[in-house]
Each structure stands twice: as structure tokens, then as C-alpha cells.
Amino acid sequence: MRRNRLFPTMIEFSRAAYDDVVSHASAGGDAEVCGVLAGTRGDDGEASVVTETYRAENVADTPRTRYAIAPEELLELIERAEDDGFDVVGFYHSHPTGPTRPSETDAARATWPGYSYVICALDGSPFVGSWRWCGDESGFEQETVAVRGER
């Protein structure tokens, strides 16, 4: 994956938002969980900052290996984030037993260039990684994940 300087390469979580992603993923058991990340979206090389998570229902036909957010719920969550005064930063989902990186299915279903796709992998200790979708030609670019100390 080549580096695209148009998009930031770092995502920073508040401690509360990071903990909520891990908690949601852990509570999902064998099924993938998903949601929307909100806060301040970084442009031109600035880090995006996630301060809010909006949990969604996974409506995929095979939730153990896939995730999907119903279009109506996705629109509702985006509107809620915007009404709360936040930018949509990206999306998250879990890989209960899968890899710590995006799968081929994740890449095939990514549709928001410039936004972050966060994965909480649970095979062993929870691992939170983030990848910026750079479009069909460039694919995903891994981002550095940072967590602020305050709650």
C-alpha cells in the first residue's frame, strides 16, 4: 500500500472512545460488532480525533465473519453525530477470531475514501488498528493509533 499524503496517517482516540470500541467488541462474543466513529476529522496530514462512538446493530447475514449496518441506521447515526456537533471520522468493527488487518471483504466493501476503518481484533489480547481507505486504486493505508490518557 502506498502512502497518500492527502489523508492523515494518524488517528487519536479519547480514552473513553477507545475503551468503548474494545468493550463493544468484547461483548459481541463470536459475532462481529460495528459502529460509527465521530469527533474531529483531520485533513491535509492532521490527525483525526475520535471522541465519540455510536454503536450499530450488525445486520450481516453471517455476523461471525461479516458486518453490515442497515442504511437507515447508518444515516440515523451520522445525523446524530452531526447534530451532536461532531464530524464522522470513520467506522469500526471487530474481528473476533480474524486478522488484525482489513480482510479482502473489508476492502471490497469500503466506500468512504479518506475515512478511517478501525478493527478491534480479539484473537488474544484486544488489538485496535486503523486503516484509511484511499480508494479502489490505492486501497487501505495503515494509520498510527494513539490514545489520550484522560477519561
Which residues make up each language-model segment?
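Conserved beta-strand-loop surface patch within small alpha/beta domains used
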Residues: R2-V88, T97-R151
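Histidine-centered divalent metal-coordination motifs
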Residues: H93-H95
